[in-house]
Amino acid sequence: MNIRIASTVLCLSLVVGGCARLPEQLPNNPKDQVDLDIPRPTGIAAAPWPAQEWWRSANDPELNRLVQIAFARNPDLRAAAAKVLLAQADVGAARSRLLPHFDADFALTQQYFSAQGLHLSANGTSNTFGALNPIDIHYHVDLWGQDRDLVRAARGRLAMNQAEAAQARLLVSTAVVVQYFALEGDRRLLQQTEHLHTLQEQAKAVAEGGFQQGLFNASQIHAEDLALAESAQRIAKLQAAIAAEKHALAALCGEGPSMTIGSATITKQALSPALGLPKNLPLRLLARRPDIVAARWAVQAAAAEVGAARAAFYPNINLRLLAGWNSIHLGDLFNPGNFAHAVGPVITLPIFEGGALRAHLRAQNAVFLAAQDRYRSTLLAALRQIADRLSTAQKLARQERAQRHAAAAAQAQWELRQQAWRQGLSDALPSIAAEITCVQVRQRRTAITTARWQNWALLESALGGGYRHTIKDG
């Protein structure tokens, strides 16, 4: 009896005190808070959150078609979807640790025993060993929560990958919209520049006629030649930019450079010139931005991995049940006397691991601290993006107002000079020059309009692009 008590005390002391020693202290990150306040600039009214298919606000069928093609064929989106499938499989693998494992095994071995061997009854003979175990059950007793932590970590990585897949869709749709607006803006600029080139050719013809009549000197012709060369260069640059933008759109859509990109049908009424911010923006932004959601789930997954690493310092307990037959002679394998069974716990004590467990715990804790910092960095970047879009919107609105005044003044000047030319009070050159000024003003307005379209798309993206956080379990 005393021997049993002593054995029990010895086992308990090994279980409690014989495990690998936990680190005395792990580094900790200060729980500093991020200021989520975004100043609302003057003139920015309240507005709803972006719709899930926010780009449809442009009312452009060609743009809608391109975004849908990109969603279906973009290779980056397919890779992100594959990562979600992998994470779902990882969740299933982690969950399997919580359940008993049922196996069956059969072994057949032919062996010859030496004449002077240790098996006296079998020495000098050849025998066939047979072992059949139809029941072999293993169950890990998750006493310290290691398996549960691993499941939580896998679920966290699944949610993170789902959010990252949503972020990839948002980035692709935003890139398509911004690139499409750039293409449409350059197409309009090309038309205007070609018109400008035609007017400059007319101005040169008038200057040459005036030179022959002695009304102008050669410097006027040289000035028109210089203007023609500059507009020709501008046309070449715009043509190259349009080709590059088409190629970029085709790549985003998972197509080759020969993909056909139709013309835009965007109207002034398609996109509201007055941008707005949703109410309760700072708090709701946490669940509206997929990159923020992904970063938050990365923190939770890393925290669960720290818990699993801590549990590795404690005894590992497994239960095993084994039942079957084994015999040194295959012919009598199923005799009742050859039936064997075993049941009991298997306890593994991590007494000395050469510092491996401590190093693994410190590594997981470092991953957790890095995930916290990435979360804060992602949140700060999101706030900065929104603030940048708002300030850009204000700047473009001021430029648009200035260009409207410039367009009105240029139009009035052209009408006066056109009237003077028709009345014979001047030659055609001042009228052509005034029309050239009108075209140049329209070019600047086109550039501003394109920038406003792109800024609208970037703001919709910065607000999450209609994303709402949901978890699809594996």
Question: What role is predicted for each listed range?
Answer:
Residues 211-215, 421-425, 462-466:
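A short glycine-centered flexible hinge/capping loop motif at secondary-structure junctions
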Residues 2-72, 131, 155, 239-287, ...:
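Terminal intrinsically disordered/low-complexity segments used for targeting and assembly
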Residues 78-79, 95-96, 141-169, 219, ...:
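Sec/SRP-type N-terminal targeting helices
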